[in-house]
Amino acid sequence: MNNKENDNVIIILPAKSEYVSTARLTASSVSTRAGFNIDEVEDIKVAVSEVCNMILSRTQNKISQYRISFDINTDNIKITFTAENTTLNCFEESIENEYGLYIMKALMDSVELCNEEHSIVMTKRIGV
């Protein structure tokens, strides 16, 4: 098997709900390649869907596309969501009690809703 350390896969999707399945399929492929088992891959797909849906519902047609970056490291995968020409405003307060946030936090090892780059970042460790 090839060395997967520091591989990076980036997709840019139209801000339309029809493309959430594309994000899920990409998450599945990248997570499998990174070495996650089938249950972990499913968890990652669900978490990615939740973030995509959150972005689409919270930005309310203010963006035309968003970017998802999958950073594969030897011991984890980091998934970063950013919007084009704008910031994904800190959703922390507005979704603190939202069910989707609980799902993301339950399925991933860490979830940052507002980092320095105004992105949404999720991390999952391999084999944990």
Identify what each model region corresponds to.
Residues M1-I10, M54-V128:
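Conserved beta-strand-loop-beta-strand hairpin that lines the nucleotide-binding pocket
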Residues T26, V30, D43, A47, ...:
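Generic alpha-helical hydrophobic packing signal
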